[in-house]
Amino acid sequence: MRRLNCELHEAPSLLKREVSSLFPDRDVIHKHLSIITLCQKTTNDMSGWSNDVEKEREELLEQFYSAAKELCGRLKSDGYWSDFIDPSSGKPYYGQYTNTTMFETDEKYRLLGYRIEDLGCCKVISHREFGRNVFIGTIFTDAHPSTGIVQVW
């Protein structure tokens, strides 16, 4: 079974407006914006909490940090802007400080084709292939999908 799913999305206008306050120093509304989601299949259902879930989440968080830093570095070395959302804070990793956040259960993910389920006590993201057994990380860039950066990576 596949453990990593990397998807490249062209940001629709509505999503550009929704995320513009995440990047106050960038004009993401009027310029091209692509979103790369790294979806890692988890062993555990991420809708609940247990020591096993917490341990797996921490491991996947470290893997995402490593992958996101590498991909952002490659994009920047090719002349593109890129940043990723720190899943632990919901804020851009490299960007200017902002009070705006985007956690993995944010409604904005619906605009990328994910389901956000309200379980009453909390919300959880659901992937069409992995269901609730998923950890999702998000990278933003001004690189167009035709650059092939995701295919090479």
Regions inferred by a protein language model and the residue ranges of each:
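Auxiliary alpha/beta "docking" domains used to position bulky ligands
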Residues: 1-153
